[in-house]
Amino acid sequence: MPTINQLVRKGREKVAVKSSAPALKGCPQKRGVCTRVYTTTPKKPNSALRKVARVRLTNGIEVTAYIGGIGHNLQEHSVVLVRGGRVKDLPGVRYHIVRGALDCAGVQNRNQGRSKYGTKRPKAKK
C-alpha cells in the first residue's frame, strides 16, 4: 500500500476501458462499402449458415459485420451502415449491419421487433 507522500508524487493510475468496437473510433455508427458478402458457420454447439459481409469503413479499416434478419439484398459495392455489437458464436464478428439504412433493405413481412430490422409499419387491414 502506498504512503500519502507516494500518492501525492505519483497518484493512482487510471484503468483504461477497452472498447468492444474499436474500428468505430468512438462513433455510434460508421458508413462503409461491402468488399465481400458470404456465409460462414458458427462455433461448436451451433450449426447454421450465418450471413456476414466484409466492410471497408470510411476511416479505412476493414471489418467483418453480421447481416441480421431473414434474407438480404447486399452484394459487393453496397454502401452500408455499421454499428457495434458482436455475434457470440461467430469468432471475429464484432459489428452488425443496420437494416433499413443506406443500401441495405429492411426485412420483408416482419411484424414484431420491426424497428430492429428496418421494416415499415404494415397498412391496417379493414
Swiss-Prot record:
PROSITE patterns linked to this entry: RIBOSOMAL_S12
Residues annotated with 3-methylthioaspartic acid modification: D89
Entries under SUPFAM superfamilies matching the protein: Nucleic acid-binding proteins
One CC-aspect GO term: small ribosomal subunit
Source species, domain of life: Bacteria
GO biological process entries: translation
Record keywords, A-Z: Methylation, Ribonucleoprotein, Ribosomal protein, RNA-binding, rRNA-binding, tRNA-binding
InterPro entries reported in the protein's UniProt record: NA-bd_OB-fold (IPR012340), Ribosomal_uS12 (IPR006032), Ribosomal_uS12_bac (IPR005679)
Record Gene3D superfamilies: Nucleic acid-binding proteins
Pfam families recorded: Ribosom_S12_S23 (PF00164)
Gene Ontology MF annotations: rRNA binding; structural constituent of ribosome; tRNA binding
Subunit structure: Part of the 30S ribosomal subunit. Contacts proteins S8 and S17. May interact with IF1 in the 30S initiation complex.
NCBIfam families: rpsL_bact
Entry function: With S4 and S5 plays an important role in translational accuracy.
Family recorded in the similarity comment: Belongs to the universal ribosomal protein uS12 family.
Protein known as: Small ribosomal subunit protein uS12
Upper taxonomic lineage: Bacteria, Bacillati, Bacillota, Clostridia, Thermoanaerobacterales
